[in-house]
């Protein structure tokens, strides 16, 4: 693993020509870095995560309530449909990651934060504080929606994630694991130092695939769970709706994303970045020398 003083060089082939793009491959984040608590940059990042998650919950939950309200009162063909809901979630994440990426990293999701922690990209201190800020922002965002449209909010489920009829808890858990894996895997790939160095002249290439990942996962899992893949989003809606239906299977929307995030981090580091092969090679070399 390169130190901050070392610069790795990647060769990028394009047609007949090859260009070299320098990139930083930062060392693993320390597990406990209490020095962060004395830095304004941490608190600025927490505010950014709080506000971004608040905005995300406001837009996404309002879209879900609006869609259900249209479906219940008028011809379903006049509503936004699953496609519109998925676009709302994906496009909002794209915008918010673009806006906050330079301040906090634009996580807006405890699963993303935990995935980066598992990948040694964040300290435990920053991870815990990010998750708290995201959950508080989600509750505030859902609260704004409920304040604006209280009657349809209460009547139409509050945008809370539930296991749909015809699906088992195990199936819903599997959908959440796979969906979160896709999202966090995309985050790791989009923010990989090699890729960002090569594509740094097109900054939109980082939030764009992340937004599309959210979009396609929603298309696949809205019929199953309403699509969680974000524990803060599920928590915010459940707290404000606060009915048995919202809490009955709420554990799925924490356990699934955490498992999916861990698997994505392991896949990226051990397979795509080749750390498993490097560790095995180092072990063999040590054994031969001994």
Curated annotation (Swiss-Prot):
Q: State the membrane topology.
A: Multi-pass membrane protein
Give the UniProt subcellular location, in the record's own words: Cell membrane
Question: What are the entry keywords?
Answer: Cell membrane, Membrane, Repeat, Transmembrane, Transmembrane helix, Transport
Span of the annotated motif NPA 2: 230-232
Q: Which GO terms describe its molecular function?
A: water channel activity
- Extract the signal peptide range: none
**Motif NPA 1 at which residues?**
109-111
Gene Ontology annotations for the cellular component aspect, listed alphabetically:
plasma membrane
Report, as the record phrases it, the tissue specificity of this protein.
Expressed in roots.
| Record's keyword annotation contains Repeat | yes
Q: Which InterPro entries match?
A: Aquaporin-like, Aquaporin_transptr, MIP, MIP_CS
Its biological purpose is as follows: Aquaporins facilitate the transport of water and small neutral solutes across cell membranes.
Q: Which PANTHER family match?
A: AQUAPORIN OR AQUAGLYCEROPORIN RELATED
**Name this protein carries in UniProt:** Probable aquaporin PIP2-7
Give the gene that encodes this protein. PIP2-7
């Amino acid at each position: 693993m390169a130190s901050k003083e070392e610069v790795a060089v990647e060769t990028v082939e394009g047609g007949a020509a090859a260009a070299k793009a320098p990139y930083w491959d930062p060392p693993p984040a320390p597990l406990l870095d209490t020095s962060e608590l004395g830095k304004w940059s941490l608190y600025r990042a927490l505010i950014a995560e709080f506000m971004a998650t608040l905005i995300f919950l406001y837009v996404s939950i309002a879209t879900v309530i609006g869609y259900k309200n249209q479906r219940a009162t008028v011809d379903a063909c006049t509503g936004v449909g699953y496609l519109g809901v998925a676009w709302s979630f994906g496009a909002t994440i794209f915008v918010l990651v673009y806006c906050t990426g330079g301040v906090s990293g634009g996580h807006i999701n405890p699963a993303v934060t935990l995935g980066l922690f598992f990948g040694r990209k964040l300290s435990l201190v920053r991870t815990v504080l990010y998750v708290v800020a995201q959950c508080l922002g989600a509750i505030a965002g859902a609260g704004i929606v409920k304040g604006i449209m209280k009657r349809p909010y209460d009547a139409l489920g509050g945008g809370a994630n539930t296991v749909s009829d015809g699906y088992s808890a195990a199936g819903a858990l599997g959908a959440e694991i796979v969906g979160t894996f896709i999202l966090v895997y995309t985050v790791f790939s989009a923010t990989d130092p090699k890729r960002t160095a090569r594509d740094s002249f097109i900054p939109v290439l980082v939030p764009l695939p992340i937004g599309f990942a959210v979009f396609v996962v929603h298309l696949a899992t809205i019929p199953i769970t309403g699509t969680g893949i974000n524990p803060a989003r599920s928590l915010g809606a459940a707290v404000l709706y606060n009915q048995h239906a919202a809490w009955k299977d709420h554990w799925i929307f924490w356990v699934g994303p955490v498992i999916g995030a861990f698997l994505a981090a392991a896949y990226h580091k051990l397979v795509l970045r080749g750390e498993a092969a490097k560790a095995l090679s180092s072990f063999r070399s040590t054994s031969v020398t001994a």
